[in-house]
Amino acid sequence: MRGVALLVAALTVVAPARAQRPLISTNPETPFKLATFEAAGKTRVGLVLGQRILDIEGAHTAVVQELALRGTPAMPRDMRTLVEDYDRIAPHLYRIANRFRDASADNPAFAFNVERVGILAPIKYPYNLLAIAANYKLHAGEMFPPGSPPQKAALDADQDKENPVFFAKSPRSCIIDPNEPYVMPPGRNIDWEGELAIVIGKPALNVTEATAHDYVFGYSIMYDVSDRGGSGRPLTGMFPGPNWFSGKSRDKAAPFGPFIVPKEFAPNPPHFHIVTKVNGTVKQDGNTANWIWNEAHMVRYLSSILTLYPGDVISSGTPDGVGAGRKPPEFLKPGDVVTIEIEGIGTLRTPMKAAQ
């Protein structure tokens, strides 16, 4: 027995040590954005790190093989599924970001230059696309005659004393991709409205303001294309006042993207600087810190009326500086290019195109 023990000890000493695989953190240490993109004829879900965009399926497979991991979930092939399953797959996305954060380290086949792929609307398509009206006092004020009772009411608006007004856009009919031209309806007055888009992360019904942020997934950019050309109804007729459907819900009237920033990499509260330009000229320059109804109020109010689902989008209102509020009014024409820049998210670009 003593000889056997000595032999085992000797083999233990001379046996080569098994190589230690590197440990890669599954904590959110490397900020990233998410995108839906097209490359090599395939639509993919991407993780954006600076100027690189990683196909999450390919990146996940590479990390699993490198670390010899077992029992890891498959990566989703569309953004809405990713949002629905985020709690389960987030650690694996964090691991991917931490592994590939050094762009100079390698250039795998699943990594692309973000400028050389087709960036699509991040979610095609949410169940609900809901937009708030007049959520900035200065914008609300610019839409009414100076000194008028409606303008005074707008400038005095208080989220604790009244509820907001929302309208719906059809996700399937309205959402278009970044850089996709908006085909202008003939004879209409098309305006610019740059907005922060809030993406819902969990089913939300009758939530409180205290818990509302728990139901948010992240943030993107929405262009609330607005038709000011005769969308109102006669004050003496049936249902007087603005016709929100014709003014806000025209075909392709919701350019969306380019990226989603998960909330763990965004400011809380979500105070973002928004700049809207037409042909490079600044038209709107605002900050979501100036909302009348804040994120918690919007989510609480909407969820008191209907269920919000993962991937649903709330377009949170536009700052002052729209064309209809200028003296004289200004509207877009074919050939114009609208860009909406939100710090920390990106730039949404929409060219205007004449109808054929």
Regions found by a protein language model. Give the residues of each.
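Bacterial N-terminal signal peptides
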Residues: 4-13
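Sec/Tat signal peptide C-region and signal peptidase I cleavage site
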Residues: 15-19
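Active-site microenvironments in enzyme catalytic cores
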Residues: 20-39, 61-62, 68-282, 297, ...
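Charged, cofactor-coupling segments
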Residues: 21-27, 32, 38-44, 48-62, ...
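Residue-level recognition of short, solvent-exposed, well-ordered loop/turn junctions
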Residues: 124, 131, 309, 333-334
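Generic structural signal for buried aliphatic residues
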Residues: 196, 314-315, 338
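A conserved acidic, glycine/proline-rich C-terminal tail/linker
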Residues: 294-332
